[in-house]
Amino acid sequence: MASEALHQVGDGEEAVLKKENFNMMNALDQLPKPFPNPKSMNRTVTTKGLPLSSKGNLVNFLEDDTINLPKPMPVDDSDCSSDDTSISAFSSTLLNPIKLAVTQPNSSFFAGMLEGELNKLSFSPMAKNTEKEDLALGPCPCPSKCQMATRGLLDLDNPELETETSSTHSESSVVVDLPDTPFIFEHTVSNSTAVISWTYALGKQPVSFYQVLLQEAAETQENELPKAKNRPWIFNKILGTTVKLMELKPNTCYCLTVRAANTAGVGKWCKPYKFATLATDFSSFPENNPIQITVRRKEPQRKIVSIGLEEMRRLEDLEYLFPY
């Protein structure tokens, strides 16, 4: 009897322990799970373009030289990665399927940015002195513009601020002009990707970032400007001079233009650069070894020719001897 009673007591303790373990497991399951480490997550380093108005085309945007960016739409955090550098967070269903990857900026780009910052620092004592004098004389005649300029980059959506050539009234001694127009000199295409590179003018006006405008173009003749087929897509705040466009349509012509921006505003768009993707023909070449084509061009050099008085007299004599 005693052994039987002990056996029953042991079974009861074992049942109590099992019940406590089961309750503990349920409590652990109900606790909120921690968010996974963002460093271990797979992130995309691509930029999605922002659609512009369907009424305009690339030629109209280049003539007007103004772009009104639409306001961002509220979406969930899961629709957009934290590394997405697009202008605003749009739903993936409304975005153009074309993606853009920005390569690491070259050393000359960083050198230009550093030179611009050093120029600002060198003129900072002079700016402070002039600012004290202006405050002693009276208030700023244009407070709205001064407040906007002290925040750094100007608002590109406001056309009134695009033509400003100085940051504040007190910094009038430091003249910052608009950046030069970029020149696209190379592109490499395949059936679905395109790598576009343009030049950066070292030693001239500093550049804060670039804007890229892409649009599918219709076929035109040699001397004709590329006609817009669909509405353009803009990629903003690009730090670098080389971009890679992905998920393009095979055997399709595209038109691309670039402009630079700095503290003075935005520069002019470069001439439309036309390129075409290759056709997808798996019978002519294997799928795992696609063909790529690279095209390079040189920027035309301007030469200045000076003619003296003697050369002018010789030309006049030749014109007299050999009239038209």
Curated annotation (Swiss-Prot):
- Give the protein's recorded name: Fibronectin type III domain-containing protein 8
Give every Fibronectin type-III domain span: 179-280
Enumerate the SUPFAM superfamilies for this protein.
Fibronectin type III
Cross-referenced SMART domains: FN3 (SM00060)
Q: What domain of life does the native source organism fall in?
A: Eukaryota
Q: Give the encoding gene's name.
A: FNDC8
Of the GO CC terms on this record, one is: nucleus
